[in-house]
Regions:
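Conserved DEDDh/DEDDy metal-dependent 3′-5′ exonuclease domain
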Residues: 2-5, 9-11, 17-25, 30-164
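Conserved small/polar residues in nucleotide/adenosyl-binding loops
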Residues: 165-170
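N-terminal low-complexity segments that are often proline-rich with Ser/Thr-Pro
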Residues: 173-175
């Protein structure tokens, strides 16, 4: 797992991520006392590398990551991504390109209008997830190992769910 705290490391990671076909992305933020959410963490997974980007680090410029968000060749996976996309839009004035929302996909597949992430992971992957860190203060540093585990687990499950939804079914494999 990579914990990215500076621009140099972010540039290196993003050059690798630019070669990815699919990225699952999630954010942690605080929205209690502000109109716009305060971005506290970005989690990314490409099927091989688990990455946490710390936007609160004083030595980081997120522009290399923002280029990835606007790369039309890379599928970006979110679950109920409205707030994540809102955060990125407020920072860049651009909407990420080529977005796949697992909540919308689940609705189309009959899971209900707003199936929660925990329920979706349980129903599709048969896995239980620990959501106890969801409402912790994500702006405090250093993050605990429990917070980091929670954050990175979210994007790994997202990736797996997307692969199941987008893989051809057995009867389609002959086409």
């Amino acid at each position: 797992m990579h914990y990215v705290k500076d621009t140099k490391e972010l540039i290196e990671i993003c050059s690798k991520l630019q070669k990815s076909k699919i990225l699952s992305i999630d954010t942690e933020f605080i929205r209690e006392k502000t109109y716009w959410p305060k971005l506290c963490l970005i989690q990314v997974y490409n099927g091989f590398e688990k990455i946490i980007i710390d936007p609160l680090s004083s030595d980081i410029d997120l522009k290399p990551f923002f280029k990835i968000l606007n790369n039309k060749e890379i599928l970006k996976i979110f679950h109920s991504g409205r707030q994540d996309i809102e955060i990125f839009y407020n920072l860049t004035k651009k909407i990420p390109k080529n977005v796949y929302d697992t909540q919308i996909a689940a609705m189309v597949c009959g899971f209900g209008e707003s199936v929660g992430y925990e329920s979706l992971v349980s129903q599709i992957l048969g896995r239980k997830i620990d959501k106890s860190s969801r409402l912790t203060n994500w702006s405090n540093r250093p993050l605990s190992s429990k917070q980091i585990d929670y954050a990175i687990t979210d994007v790994t499950h997202l990736y797996d769910i997307c692969l199941l939804y987008t893989s051809p079914s057995p009867r389609d494999s002959s086409k």
